[in-house]
Amino acid sequence: VAFSENGVQLSLAYSEYPTSAGAGDMNADTIFDAAKDVIARCVSGGKVERSDVAAISVTSFGEACVPVDREGNCLCDMIMYTDRRGVSENERLIEKLGRKYISSVTCANPAPMYSLPKIMWMSENISAVRESAFRFLQAADFICYRLSGEFTTTYTQACRTDAFDVERLRWSPELLEAAGIRMEQMPDPVPNGTVIGLLRRELAAELGLSDTVKIVAGSQDQIAAATGAGVLSAGQAVDGTGSVECITPVFDRIIKSEGFTSNNYVCVPHSVVGLYATYA
């Protein structure tokens, strides 16, 4: 979607990236090609002047991540959150650190849907990942990397790994160590809205855009929906519909009660500094 600086929608493009029936994984290169396609179509047709494009931001689903090597090449497909790989790995994490401790750090009930147990599965079962993984990136992280050359993630995306310390806004050394993952294999976490770099020159030429276009960290999709709907204060909520229906209420503090997380409610940073949200 292309917006003016005042938030007026100027153009819209949509692209599917179908997978085989019953598959629990997705090709990250295919997703990036679709992203390029919708960017190109958003700035074609005369509704948007290419020279006026100032920034590109990306929002995506969470959990699923792709391992890349030093050159940014994908080492395997992304394992989606619906895939059952990672069940035994999640149990091992709980046995090592305890469910209560993990929840106290991540503000989430540990589950195999998150990135960390799936990263463990990939590292233990795919030799290319075990030998060459340089970064583990979620979908938005991967697209932003391909656009800018920078390895980053947003706080809201990082929370979907079950390896992020919500209170300290950093990767948890204890969780990564328990999973056998090095800290440097994770992208740098930044606040939503951070300018992470400029559009790569070769992509600028391909898309007909300026290489001064800023690449801006977006957010996990439900937080983006809340922000776009104007849910910017504690006590407000949005009901978003799409592939799933999700109610996103906003709080002015971190909620860490055992009853909250045991019922599978999370607590994640909002796009507005000092606010937090959950998904229901």
Range-by-range predicted roles:
Residues 70, 92, 96-97, 101:
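Hydrophobic or amphipathic alpha-helical targeting/insertion segments
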Residues 1-77, 88, 104, 132, ...:
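N-terminal glycine/serine-rich phosphate-binding loop of ATP-dependent small-molecule kinases
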Residues 65-70, 74-90, 133, 137-172, ...:
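Glycine-rich phosphate-binding loop of actin/hexokinase-like ATP-binding domains
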Residues 17, 60, 82, 193, ...:
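Residues that line or immediately flank small-molecule/substrate-binding pockets and catalytic motifs
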Residues 10-14, 88-89, 192-206, 250-262:
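Acidic-glycine-rich active-site phosphate/pyrophosphate-binding loop
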